[in-house]
């Protein structure tokens, strides 16, 4: 049975969502942390700057949009549309100082602008002006509807004034059952901050009991128990969480600290950090639920209040990855403090983002430096091996996987990928006996793993080995992953390799329906059609494959087939490679 908190609706929390949507053109442009106005050419006319701002917004270039809107507004300061767009661009770009200033002007025109009230309230919280912040939150229309976000921030404002009774009262007015765990979590943090340990323990236990999958709920409750001298209770909470989500760096650090009897810091140390935690929670929910634009604003504001928050920085970076803004993802990962347990993972993600941007050499250098600094870190070694493998440096990648496997010690089920990918590297570097042994080891650790079944099964078919067992493996893989076009393709291509062309065509058609835009699969289906005398359809598929940016070594082969078709079976050239070039998974 799912916990109530797992149904937490982001829209229930976003009392500013209406205002956000009014300025979606500017907010959707969010890509960078700091405007780089020195690189921009400011126009001489207001219409020119306004047009540049619109173009920058369409290109998701918020720094430029903010600069151009500001310049356009400077020429036409009474334009309400420009004012709101400039405000939204500043807010989504993380420029809280400008946003709050523009927000003041917006409120002069529209006292019910909720987004402007939010920006000003957050500024007041940052400055310790909690009464003023509460006044702005109370002035928002949605506050009268018992909004979750407003209630959370109001409660933390009361906490900043050491008023526990009113803080808890603000939270307990929340009536949505889906948010009760979130409510109790913040009530517990406030009670702990203000010294009511019994109330803190009751509330945090309630939140944790409601959702044991929540990292924040588990961490906060365990830290409270540790502070009260219950190290065994804290350890059990962390260990139980590790059974659900293994190897989380924050949990591993906390367990290590408990083992050496080090004190665990509370989740928040003051009301400002508590408000940041509330914004982080709502923004994180938005990121998970695909409500990306409001989530971006909340995460930006959270970092404004607590710039050192590692979880917020990582969540913001992940959001930028969703938005395919690699530069901004890298900048956000760079905000993770060097002392954080998440720093290693953040540095690895920076390298992977660089690789995705085509900066593979720089990415490789970064990962090499990481591994040199921490030579026994499995995560770093695995990332380096993955990058080497994707660059087709199979011998180097296998050596990195060697080191990762050695660092693991006794392999467990979740280490199957190390053997699987090392096996691929061995297979690609013509070391089949080693590859076969690794694939078998991966299956020993994770029986019936479909990707491994697919790769080993096809490899056996390709070499004419263990054919009966190989086809059992391939069929099993398809049964387990019937919607994986690459795995279905492998079964079809195995039929083709054995001359079972009618069955191959039938199976490969299923693969194409699942993965229509892959050049290898289209090439395979074209070959199968040719063998069953469907020549026009064969050319159609080969032409598709040609137009889908195939690998450079495949393109000449495809062009040759388009020109002259396939040779007779008795004089056939070596068959094209199978789709396990994709490692069997989509």
PLM regions and their residue ranges:
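Residue-level recognition of tetratricopeptide repeat
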Residues: 54, 88, 122, 156, ...
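Structural marker of alpha-solenoid helical repeat scaffolds
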Residues: 75, 108-110, 142-143, 174-177, ...
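N-terminal leader/linker segments that initiate helical-solenoid repeat arrays
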Residues: 26-86, 91-101, 111, 255-258, ...
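Canonical tetratricopeptide repeat
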Residues: 85-86, 119, 153, 186, ...
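Position-specific recognition of the canonical hydrophobic site in helix A of tetratricopeptide repeat
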Residues: 57, 91, 125, 159, ...
């Amino acid at each position: 049975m799912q916990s109530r908190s797992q149904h937490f609706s982001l829209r229930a929390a976003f009392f500013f969502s209406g205002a956000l949507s009014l300025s979606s053109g500017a907010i959707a442009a969010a890509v960078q942390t700091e405007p780089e106005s020195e690189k921009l050419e400011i126009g001489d006319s207001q219409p020119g700057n306004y047009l540049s701002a619109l173009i920058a917004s369409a290109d998701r270039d918020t720094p430029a949009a903010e600069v151009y809107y500001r310049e356009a507004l400077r020429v036409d300061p009474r334009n309400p549309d420009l004012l709101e767009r400039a405000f939204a661009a500043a807010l989504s770009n993380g420029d809280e100082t400008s946003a709050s200033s523009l927000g003041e002007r917006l409120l002069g025109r529209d006292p019910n602008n909720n987004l402007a009230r939010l920006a000003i309230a957050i500024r007041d919280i940052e400055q310790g002006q909690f009464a003023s912040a509460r006044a702005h939150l109370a002035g928002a229309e949605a506050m009268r509807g018992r909004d979750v976000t407003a209630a959370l921030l109001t409660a933390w404002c009361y906490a900043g004034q050491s008023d526990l009774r009113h803080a808890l009262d603000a939270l307990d007015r929340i009536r949505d059952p889906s948010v009760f765990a979130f409510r109790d979590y913040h009530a517990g943090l406030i009670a702990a901050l203000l010294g009511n340990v019994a109330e803190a323990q009751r509330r945090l236990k309630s939140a944790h009991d409601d959702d044991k999958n929540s990292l924040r709920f588990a961490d906060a409750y365990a830290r409270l128990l540790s502070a009260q001298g219950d190290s065994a209770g804290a350890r059990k909470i962390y260990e139980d969480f590790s059974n659900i989500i293994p190897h989380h760096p924050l949990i591993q650090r906390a367990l290590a600290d408990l083992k050496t009897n080090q004190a665990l810091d509370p989740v928040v140390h003051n009301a400002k950090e508590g408000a940041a935690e509330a914004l982080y929670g709502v923004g994180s929910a938005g990121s998970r639920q695909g409500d990306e634009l409001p989530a971006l604003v909340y995460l930006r504001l959270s970092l404004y209040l607590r710039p050192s928050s590692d979880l917020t920085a990582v969540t913001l970076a992940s959001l930028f990855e969703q938005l395919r803004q690699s530069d901004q993802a890298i900048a956000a990962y760079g905000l993770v403090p060097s002392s954080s347990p998440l720093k290693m993972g953040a540095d690895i993600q920076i390298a992977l983002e660089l690789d995705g941007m085509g900066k593979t050499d720089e990415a490789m250098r970064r990962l090499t430096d990481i591994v040199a600094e921490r030579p026994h870190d499995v995560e770093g070694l695995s990332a380096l091996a993955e990058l080497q493998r994707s660059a087709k440096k199979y011998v180097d990648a296998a050596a990195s996987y060697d080191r990762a496997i050695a660092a693991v010690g006794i392999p467990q089920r979740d280490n199957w990928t190390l053997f699987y990918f090392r096996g691929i590297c061995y297979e690609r570097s013509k070391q089949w006996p080693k590859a076969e042994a690794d694939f078998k080891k991966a299956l020993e650790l994770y029986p019936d793993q479909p990707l491994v079944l697919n790769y080993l099964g096809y490899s056996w078919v390709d070499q004419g080995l263990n054919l009966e067992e190989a086809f059992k493996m391939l069929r099993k893989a398809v049964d387990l992953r019937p919607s994986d076009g690459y795995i279905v393709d492998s079964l079809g291509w195995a039929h083709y390799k054995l001359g079972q062309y009618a069955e191959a065509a039938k199976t490969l058609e299923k693969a194409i329906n699942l993965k229509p835009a892959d050049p290898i699969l289209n090439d395979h289906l074209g070959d199968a059609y040719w063998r069953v005398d469907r020549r026009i359809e064969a050319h159609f598929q080969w032409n598709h494959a040609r137009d889908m940016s195939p690998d450079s070594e495949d393109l000449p082969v495809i062009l040759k087939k388009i020109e002259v078709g396939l040779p007779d079976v008795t004089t056939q050239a070596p068959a094209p490679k199978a789709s396990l070039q994709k490692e069997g998974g989509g």
